[in-house]
């Protein structure tokens, strides 16, 4: 059956009916050989299913599977049940009696049954599915098609009970030829853009079970472009009868959109299962390189049948694909890629050739692969390596991964380039290309902090039985300590002689990598050499348990909907103080500290910070796992600010809060640390969800940290002491910003009480009397802080000047509100800070009456820009003008003399501004109260100094 005379057909020379018959018999002989090979790998029950399928579609019998009613579409064109099939049916149903149908073949609704997939091929497995094409007459009514679908479902159920997975696909022959399939779930494709490539696969690999045979068989491969002309002649001149053939179309032309679309589809599948998809991926690449004159594999198959080359091994669908790729890659001078194709084919077939096996026990697949491997000149060592794939560990997988990733990346770039060259003709939406690009990026792109997935379907299990975890000390070769993982159980004097599987500066990053890639699983035993760290076996076990809880592997495939959106955090694991004892000194001395100050951010009398390090593991919606390490005094606020900035609501995206886990397993105060950190993160996240600009004040030891939150960004500023905090709080603001205090911030400070009472659209005045002086604090309408200490004579003289000034501002503001759409009038509220048994509290006070009097001399200031942007001052005392234009540097002395001349009392006392105009300084915006108070303080200081000097 290896070599037969070549056969040819030519319309111009006339068609020989005998040659047509010989061609049909050749294709049927190849089909018979494939069917026989398919049966060899099946169990007796599975073989029964295969034998009975034509009969089940030929008749409706209540004793046989698939029966719905006598009127359900049935009747396989030209089918006659032989004795072997009838005997099989009677073994299934003893009382079954076969009654031949009296329909003419042309009237029978089932035109053909074909098996697709790997059955009968080199890659057939014990559990290969049976993908069955049920080709039916185009005139079937919708109701009849629905009945046929139900019949198919019943047959699938019965086959499943026999240990076979059968999947039926209804094919309307006429519509299929016009690329209008009714079943868009065909095997091996995305179902939408691969019509001709699917037809190519059908013609080269389908096994005919019964009914009409493909008309395509009888059209010479050299004349594929005259397919329609040949078909008209063969049918019109009755060289063949119409009821003997079915026409699914030709392969003269494959549109660019098909091989680009198929390449994208296969590339997407190859990310998780490279060996299963790389062959088809490279095939589409080869087709794309030949476009527009593609000689697809099915045509080469037909060429060999016409040429009389009927060796079943060489006509095997997978060998045909391999030969096509071999030619293509040799032309491309790509031997490394050809070797990858060979490995993919070898692993796809799954026959281990490295071990010894008796010749009589070798199946046809084994023998066929032996011939190929001998042709490739593979050494036994290579076979042994591939045969042990199930035992491959990290080093072998890493080496193979480099090749696979390079191949996938190259294929994507090539497809992208071809799609751009084809432009609109490619039929590929840029969305699809972008989607796949993101999928590749998420799976394989390296970036700082990202935990690599080294095993994209290369080996089934990377788990190690025993590993050694070591902290490598800093030395001449290493500027700082590192962590490394070694295979096996190594002692302290052994590991320096071995190469580690993986090393990292950070322990958590190393453990996350081991867990993500399955190197450490629940059965792995670990030997620990902690070095200078405080890591113990119990903490290590807890860390690994937390990783397993946080990141169950393998991860689910990312949905397209997620890839179409920007990345967002799905879940976060915070590990606090990994390998660090925050109270190491006490632990070494075996001391237990008793204290009433238990906050872990200000612990005991010295206000120690017990949160020394944080490791944040983040899983985003693209399944990217990243690790970030934070250490030092800024660790917690930096981690918190970056977390909040990552989870803040993005424009156009609804808020989707990530799952948050916080764990701490250090020796001292672990539970309290974890609870405190988690509460802090949840509280600030809740504040962020408010959607309005706001601030959060955190105190760690004696240092303050202010988080600025807005829909646009989250930032963090550290302030080393209280004066720095006051200066920061006194900055002008663009709008109101609420300020929330951590529950332990500013404990015992009156500032904490003041800041916690901030309200919008309100000016709040707080005062605290201390013997001969008082401190006034004011929160303006934008929640900015102004603070001033001044001499205290009595409560009236303390507050009345300020009230008079604030009322003047409100009058000015109200007058502008109608013209410039300034917000409505503000409330002015007064509070006194009092101490009761050492505990501060606040009591509201009535606003003082701003009556005219000696201390409330009418004094107005007007400021405007002079030359070189210098502020120029004009003062009005009882409506008399004093300007710098007239008095120059002596302005304040002139005003002081005027004031003293009008005083009845000789005793000096301060003077206060009663009104201030800044409209010339803030022409484009409304100044906030803070601006007025700043200028007021400067002017009053200068005036009162001049009064003292008189």
Residues covered by each model-derived region:
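Nucleotidyltransferase catalytic cores
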Residues: 1-91, 179-183, 199-950
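Well-ordered mid-protein domain cores that form the structural environment of catalytic cofactors
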Residues: 68-127
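Short, charged/polar micro-motifs that form catalytic or ligand-binding hotspots
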Residues: 103, 135-145, 327-334
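Catalytic metal-binding acidic patch
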Residues: 114-117, 121-147, 165-170
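Amphipathic alpha-helical scaffolding segments
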Residues: 130-140, 147-153, 342-343, 359-371
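E2/UBC-UEV (E2-variant) core
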Residues: 147, 151-165
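Short, conserved secondary-structure transition motifs
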Residues: 164-186
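Acidic, Ser/Thr-rich peripheral helices and adjacent loops at domain boundaries
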Residues: 187-195
């Amino acid at each position: 059956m290896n070599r037969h005379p070549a056969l040819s057909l030519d319309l111009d020379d006339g068609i020989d009916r005998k040659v047509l018959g010989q061609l049909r018999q050749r294709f049927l002989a190849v089909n018979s050989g494939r069917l026989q090979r398919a049966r060899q790998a099946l169990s007796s029950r599975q073989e029964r299913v295969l034998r009975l399928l034509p009969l089940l579609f030929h008749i409706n019998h209540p004793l046989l599977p698939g029966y719905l009613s006598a009127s359900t579409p049935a009747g396989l064109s030209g089918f006659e049940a032989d004795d072997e099939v009838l005997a099989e049916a009677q073994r299934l149903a003893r009382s079954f009696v076969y009654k031949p149908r009296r329909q003419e073949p042309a009237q029978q609704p089932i035109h053909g049954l074909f098996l697709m997939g790997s059955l009968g091929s080199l890659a057939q497995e014990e559990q290969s599915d049976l993908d069955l094409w049920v080709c039916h007459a185009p005139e079937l009514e919708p109701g009849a098609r629905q009945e046929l679908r139900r019949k198919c479902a019943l047959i699938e159920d019965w086959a499943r009970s026999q240990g076979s997975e059968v999947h039926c696909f209804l094919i309307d022959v006429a519509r299929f030829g016009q690329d209008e399939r009714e079943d868009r779930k065909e095997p091996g494709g995305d179902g939408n853009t691969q019509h001709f490539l699917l037809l190519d696969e059908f013609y080269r690999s389908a096994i005919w079970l019964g009914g009409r045979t493909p008309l395509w068989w009888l059209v010479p491969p050299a004349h594929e472009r005259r397919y329609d002309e040949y078909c008209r002649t063969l049918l019109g001149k009755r060289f063949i009868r119409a009821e003997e053939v079915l026409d699914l179309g030709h392969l003269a032309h494959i549109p660019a959109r098909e091989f680009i679309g198929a390449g994208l589809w296969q590339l997407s599948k190859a990310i998780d299962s490279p060996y299963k998809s790389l062959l088809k991926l490279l095939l589409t690449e080869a087709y794309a390189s030949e476009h527009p004159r593609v000689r697809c594999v099915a045509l080469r198959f037909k060429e060999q049948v016409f040429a009389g080359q009927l060796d079943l091994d060489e006509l095997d669908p997978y060998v045909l694909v391999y030969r096509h790729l071999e030619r293509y890659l040799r032309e491309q001078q790509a031997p490394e890629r050809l070797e990858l194709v060979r490995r993919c084919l070898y692993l796809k077939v799954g026959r281990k050739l490295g071990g010894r096996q008796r010749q009589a026990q070798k199946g046809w697949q084994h023998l066929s692969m032996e011939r190929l491997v001998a042709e490739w000149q593979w050494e036994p060592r290579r076979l042994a390596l591939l045969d042990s794939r199930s035992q491959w560990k990290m080093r072998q997988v890493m080496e193979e991964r480099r090749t696979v990733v390079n191949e996938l990346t190259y294929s994507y770039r090539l497809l992208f380039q071809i799609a751009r060259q084809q432009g609109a003709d490619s039929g590929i939406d840029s969305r699809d290309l972008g989607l796949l690009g993101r999928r590749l990026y998420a799976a394989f792109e390296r970036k700082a902090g990202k935990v690599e997935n080294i095993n994209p379907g290369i080996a089934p299990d990377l788990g190690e039985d025993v590993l050694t975890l070591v902290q490598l000390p800093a030395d001449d070769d290493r500027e700082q300590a590192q962590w490394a993982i070694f295979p096996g159980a190594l002692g302290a004097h052994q590991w320096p002689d071995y190469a580690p599987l993986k090393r990292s500066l950070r322990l958590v990053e190393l453990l996350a990598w081991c867990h993500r890639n399955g190197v450490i699983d629940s059965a792995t035993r670990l030997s620990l050499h902690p070095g200078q760290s405080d890591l113990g076996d119990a903490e290590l076990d807890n860390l690994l348990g937390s990783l397993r809880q946080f990141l169950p592997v393998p991860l689910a495939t990312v949905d397209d909907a997620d890839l179409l959106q920007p990345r967002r955090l799905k879940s976060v694991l915070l590990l606090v103080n990994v390998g660090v004892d925050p109270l190491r000194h006490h632990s070494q001395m075996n001391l237990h500290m008793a204290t009433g100050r238990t906050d872990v951010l200000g612990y005991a009398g010295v206000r120690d910070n017990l949160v020394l390090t944080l490791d944040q593991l983040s899983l985003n919606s693209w399944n990217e796992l990243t690790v970030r390490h934070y250490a030092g005094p800024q660790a917690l606020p930096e981690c918190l600010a970056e977390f909040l900035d990552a989870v803040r609501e993005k424009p156009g995206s609804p808020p989707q809060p990530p799952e948050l886990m916080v764990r701490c397993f250090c020796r001292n105060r672990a539970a309290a640390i974890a609870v405190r950190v988690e509460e802090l993160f949840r509280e600030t996240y809740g504040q962020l969800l408010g959607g309005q600009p706001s601030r959060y004040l955190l105190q760690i030891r004696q240092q303050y940290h202010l988080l600025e939150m807005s829909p646009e960004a989250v930032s963090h500023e550290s302030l080393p002491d209280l004066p720095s905090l006051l200066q920061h709080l006194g900055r002008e603001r663009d709008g109101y910003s609420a300020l929330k205090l951590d529950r332990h911030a500013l404990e015992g400070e009156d500032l904490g009480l003041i800041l916690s009472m901030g309200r919008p659209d309100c000016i709040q005045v707080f005062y605290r009397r201390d013997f001969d002086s008082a401190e006034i604090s004011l929160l303006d309408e934008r929640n900015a802080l102004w603070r001033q200490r001044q001499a205290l004579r009595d409560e009236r003289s303390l507050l009345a000047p300020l009230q008079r000034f604030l009322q003047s501002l409100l009058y000015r503001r109200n007058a502008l509100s109608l013209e410039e759409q300034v917000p409505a009038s503000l409330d002015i509220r007064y509070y006194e800070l009092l101490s009761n048994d050492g505990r501060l509290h606040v009591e509201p006070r009535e606003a003082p009456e701003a009556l005219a009097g000696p201390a409330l001399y009418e004094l107005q200031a007007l400021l405007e820009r002079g030359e070189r942007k210098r502020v120029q001052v004009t003062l009005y005392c009882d409506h008399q003008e004093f300007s710098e234009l007239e008095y120059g540097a002596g302005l304040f002395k002139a005003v002081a003399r005027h004031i003293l001349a009008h005083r009845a009392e000789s005793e000096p006392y301060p003077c206060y501004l009663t009104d201030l105009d800044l409209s010339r300084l803030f022409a484009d915006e409304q100044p906030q109260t803070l601006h007025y108070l700043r200028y007021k303080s400067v002017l009053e200081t200068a005036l009162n100094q001049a009064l003292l000097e008189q």
